[in-house]
C-alpha cells in the first residue's frame, strides 16, 4: 500500500512503532500529504471475505491511542469490500475507507489502474516465488519487468522461471 500511496503523492513509512497513551502500537503505514498525517491499517484477505465492523472499531481504538503523535485521521485499506456496518461506523467516527469498489470510483482498483500498477499477486506464481519477489521489493508487475532476468535470478529464481514470470508480467501490463 505504501508504494501505491507514493504513486499518488504521499510520503510513507511502513511498520512504524509508536508509543500510544496506553500501549505500544505498530502502524502498518504512516502516510502524509497536504498537511494530513494518516494512520493506515492494511487488511488483506486471500479469500473473498469482507472487512467488517470489528476491524473498523479496532482501527479507531488504535487511532485514539496514538492520536497525540500528530495523526489526523485513521484509514483502512483492504483488498475486499467493507460491510455496511463498517461503512456506517467509519462515517460516524471519521475513518477513511479504501477497498474494492469503495468509495465508488475511488476504490483500490481505480487507484491501481490509474497509475498502471498491477500487483504481482495477480500473476500465476507459487507462494515461494511471490514471497521472494516481495522480499526483494518487487510488488508490481512493472517492478518485475524493470528488474529483469538477472535480478530475478539473484533473488533465487531459475533462469527459466525468471523468464516465465517476466513474460507473464509483460502480458498483464499490456
Curated annotation (Swiss-Prot):
UniProt xrefs under InterPro entries: AF1548-like_C, DNA_repair_Rad51/TF_NusA_a-hlx, Restrct_endonuc-II-like, Restrct_endonuc_IV_Mrr, tRNA_endonuc-like_dom_sf
GO molecular function: DNA binding; endonuclease activity; nucleotide binding
GO biological process terms held by the UniProt record: DNA restriction-modification system
This protein's name: Uncharacterized protein AF_1548
